[in-house]
Amino acid sequence: MNFLNESQTLWRDTVHQFVEQEITREYIRKCDTERAYPYEGYAKIARAGWLKLLIPESAGGDGGDIFDYALMCEGTGKFGFDFATAVMVSTFTAMNIVHHGSKEQQEQFLVPFMEGKSRFSISISEPQAGSDAANTKTRATLENGQWVIRGQKLWCSGAAADNVVIAMLVRTGEGKSKHEGLSVLLIPNNTPGVTIRRLPTLARRATGTTEIFLDEARVPESAVLGKPGQGWSIITEHLELERIAVAAAYVGNAQTAVDDALRYAHDRIQFDRAIYEFQVLRHMLADMQTQVDAARLLVYRAASLAAASTPCTREVAMAKLFASETLQTVSRQGMQILGGHGMLPEADMERYFREGMQSTIGGGTSQIQRTIIAKSMKI
């Protein structure tokens, strides 16, 4: 793989500087503490033009590649993965609309998204359909030119925010396997019959994780993305982008966890010297930085392969697996280094730790990633 060229280095530095100065760790901490969606931060990202980074120029976007996007996600995840989630989850559906949406859908949804006036959420999981996502029970039937939807969805990120269109996986028919007969419907979150409840989760407190109840909710027949029955291929097509993006954001958050722990180790005086002078702390910090650097390289490799349209299912799974477990590990070690101070919200480490705990679950569990890797090894 090639390491960053001059323009990529400039772009990465620009994102990090923007997040430090315009978003700030204090703002992200406040959103987390108050369980408040980061509307102001999201709007700043939109005004900077970054929401249209991946959108093709033909659709009014910048036509950037997935490597550029990974660098952006690394930066937006700097002070917490949750903020990056607000940006990423919208982009995943936007790209599905780019690839599969009708001309009318692209005109209706993409321009407001790029301007930051609307956002997207993805709804796949259900109470009995997590990793086994094709076991979808939520059903949509076509009645008098409308899809009538009944069921329940779970673990939907950002669905309760204002002006959200939900890309929802539903069952519209039957087939030889459970992967057939699935469709994706674009459902505004203020649709009558749609009830959304924020869940009091350990992590992702700002963007919000929700459950959705659908009681004969109705949307036009034209709300289907692509064609009926194409849902499984559409919803899984974005997984490569999603896993590279979240892995990059994990790396950004993990690096800050190391930086914060290192700064504390310099400032904290015990037994008449800074605690970093104790070898046990130096070794902990050395291991933490090594893990983050290794995770970053795996992410950059996966992103560079994807940008070159090279098959990289295995490399993407490795990046997601290692980056998520790295965030979990270094945030836990950061908590140990900060001691009692780490338990306080203003230290931020406890937020990184909470995000680290969900990182090995969301976007495909570590066990699923290992299964993908093992399959690529023919074992």
Positions of PLM-derived features:
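A short, charged helix-loop
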Residues: 210-237
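Short Ser/Thr-interspersed hydrophobic loop/turn segments at strand-loop and sheet-helix junctions
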Residues: 49, 72-77, 170, 187-192, ...
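Alpha-helical interface subdomain recognition
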Residues: 1-79, 83, 100-105, 112-117, ...
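Active-site-adjacent elements of ketosynthase-type condensing enzymes
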Residues: 128-137
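Helix-loop "lid/cap" segments that line or gate small-molecule binding pockets
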Residues: 91-100
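Flexible, small-/acidic-enriched active-site or ligand-binding loops
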Residues: 135, 190-218
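A short, Trp-centered hydrophobic/proline-enriched beta-strand micro-motif
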Residues: 116-124, 168-169
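A short core secondary-structure module
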Residues: 146, 150-195
